[in-house]
Amino acid sequence: MATAYIETTIPSYYTARNARSILQASRQLATQEWWDGGCSGFDLVTSTETLNEAGEGDPEMAKERLGLLRGIRVLPVTSEAADLARGLVAAGLVPGIAAPDAVHIALASVHKIDFLVTWNFKHIANPHIRERMRAKINDSGYRMPVMCSPEELLNEDEAI
């Protein structure tokens, strides 16, 4: 079974109040469809980084986000993952202010996860830096996971 790393935007979109923006609302719906549809049969994993981020903000919403993640296997932050995350920041592929995003990418790469599921197209699933990021990760001895949104993972019969 393929593995999928759940990054913070997934529980955030799933549990968010109804959005007024059409784009945000469609992302919420796609996330809910994918999640409620059994996550398309993936073996889900997450990290303490995701749990920490999901626990921030409004206490009631944080409780919902953390509840959604309950029972999902948590990947350990290894020295290899920390080194790779620092390398992604040092190479300018992820800005220092977004270092937690580099941790998500590094954890999924080091732990050989197949997919990193995210709505973060600025620092994680950014097509403008994807190939440079892949090269940096490969040069570090790891394989970059496929970075995609829940919408991209919906089965044909689930597609919205």
Regions found by a protein language model. Name each.
Residues 140-160:
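C-terminal interaction segment
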Residues 125-146:
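C-terminal end-helix/capping segment
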Residues 48, 78, 148-151:
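Residues at the C-termini of beta-strands that transition into short coil/loop
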Residues 1-46, 55-66, 72, 90-95, ...:
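Short, well-structured N-terminal submotif of metal-dependent ribonuclease cores
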Residues 71-132, 154, 159:
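Active-site neighborhoods of divalent-metal-dependent phosphate/nucleic-acid chemistry enzymes
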Residues 8, 48, 119-121:
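Short secondary-structure boundary segments
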Residues 42, 72, 114, 143-145:
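A structural micro-motif
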